[in-house]
């Protein structure tokens, strides 16, 4: 009888211990939503996450790049070297030159234009100092580099021709440039003065602002 009671007490103690241990064990942590997903769902989500970062980088790469306009050249040589001459209207010589047409599209204030002219040992240099419109045509004006204040250069841009007038202490020049081909004709006003008095000595044309040339040919 005593043994039976002891066995019953031992069984009760062991059962109580097991129940207490079960009550004291912490509940297993709840799985995260990602862990609860099936392996197939996780495998499908992985490529989407991997593509998200490159897509953002691609968006940044496709952002428009600011367009920068190149600065105008400080010095432009329209033509250089000795000019070829031919007899023009009324026997007055014309001197021929060749200009790169694109150069006349890049005129800018402060720019120095350089060109060789008949009767001058060194190329003429003139700096563009002002611009305005006259009769709908752009006009540029400037003075000679290291020249006298009375010396000047005027450029009138037409759609077909560009007219350039140069006034120096030694005489004046009229220049006509074909905008499309760049072919250029230079007329020395001293030749016109000599033509008016063929029997006299060579006389430099007086320094003066040239009378307006006919407007450049328009399309």
From Swiss-Prot:
Residues 191-204 have a biased composition (Basic and acidic residues). It is a single-pass membrane protein. The chain crosses the membrane at residues 4-24. This is Biofilm-associated metzincin protease inhibitor. The keyword Membrane applies. Residues 209-219 have a biased composition (Pro residues). Residues 191-219 are annotated as: Disordered. The gene is bamI. Induction: Constitutes an operon together with PA2783. Its expression is up-regulated in biofilms, while it is poorly expressed in planktonic cells. It comes from the Bacteria. It is found in: Cell membrane. The keyword Transmembrane applies. GO terms for molecular function: peptidase inhibitor activity. Keywords: Cell membrane, Membrane, Metalloenzyme inhibitor, Metalloprotease inhibitor, Protease inhibitor, Transmembrane, Transmembrane helix. GO terms for cellular component: extracellular space; plasma membrane. Inhibitor of the metalloendopeptidase Mep72. Forms a protein-protein complex with the protease, which is the product of its coregulated adjacent gene, and probably prevents premature protease activity until the protein has been secreted.
């Amino acid at each position: 009888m005593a043994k039976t009671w002891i066995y019953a007490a031992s069984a009760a103690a062991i059962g109580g211990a097991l129940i207490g241990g079960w009550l004291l064990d912490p509940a297993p942590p709840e799985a995260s939503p990602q862990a609860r997903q099936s392996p197939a769902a996780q495998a499908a989500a992985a490529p989407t996450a991997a593509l998200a970062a490159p897509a953002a980088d691609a968006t940044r790469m496709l952002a428009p790049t600011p367009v920068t306009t190149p600065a105008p050249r400080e010095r432009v040589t329209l033509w250089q070297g000795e000019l070829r001459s031919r007899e023009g209207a009324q026997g007055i010589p014309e001197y021929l030159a060749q200009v790169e047409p694109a150069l006349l599209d890049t005129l800018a204030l402060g720019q120095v234009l350089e060109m060789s002219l008949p009767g001058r040992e060194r190329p003429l240099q003139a700096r563009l100092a002002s611009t305005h419109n006259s009769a709908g045509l752009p006009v540029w004006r400037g003075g000679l580099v290291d020249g006298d204040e009375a010396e000047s250069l005027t450029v009138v841009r037409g759609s077909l021709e560009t007219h350039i007038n140069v006034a120096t202490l030694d005489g004046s020049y009229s220049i006509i440039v074909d905008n499309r081909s760049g072919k250029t004709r230079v007329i020395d006003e001293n030749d016109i003065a000599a033509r008016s008095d063929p029997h006299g000595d060579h006389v430099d044309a007086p320094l003066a602002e040239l009378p307006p040339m006919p407007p450049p040919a328009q399309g």
